[in-house]
Amino acid sequence: MMEVNTKNLTAAERVVLARKTERPSTRDYIEAVIDDFIPLAGDRNKGEDESILGGIGFFRGKPVTVIGHQKGNDLEENIKYRFGMPNPEGYRKAIRLMEQAEKFKRPVITFVDTPGAYPGIEAEAGGQGEAIAKSIATMSCLKVPTVSVFIGEGGSGGALAIGVADKMIMLENSIFSILSPEGFASILWKDSSRWEEACEVMKLTAGDLLELGICDKVIEEGEGAHINKTHIFNSVEREIAKALGQLSGKKGEQLASERYKKLRNIGRDYGRD
């Protein structure tokens, strides 16, 4: 097989890669880097949403809480998980697991991979906006170490809900943006066919976000996460361990304070000379 290097790809090409069905999902990363994982279900309010996978397990021998968007590895699974777009129940489950993690002083590891929260009428009627807002507020105030790993798409508030962490790690071909490039082009230019141009303007790649100070670490993929799976799993485990090591000696109040300052400083110097 011919070797392909993804270092010099355009932003649009990275968006295509971020969306590939063959990329490892949250479930794959959990199986690779978390031992004795026990999934936990339900939001204790309305029901269960399998597009948010969460539970407890051990990372290098230490107990952790893990939460992530779950996409499918084929069309049937993608329909089941709504292509990784959670309902309010999913975000309320995430909130429940975060609060539980803080109670038992477990670090929180999240895997982000979603086009955005599910935009259905039932989801909106069920309080989608409130659930996302509360998830962001809960995660941003946690007094335990938090690490987010962006493994594919990071779309809008649906990604932000479990992505406001102390340390943000991105795979080289993952993305994070306020909305999809197609949506951006449709709204600003009334022409969704200009989505590739939008990709460049939006600064949504891991490299862009590292340069802007939003992302803390970019993991190189080589030929792509869907090809070099073992390499990617090892790299992700190593970077999570490094991030948790940097956070482990800090007290809860210090973690929350530093996280607040980090989030408040995002964009403060953007556009200045």
PLM regions and their residue ranges:
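Terminal-region recognition feature
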Residues: 1-186, 190-193, 200-273
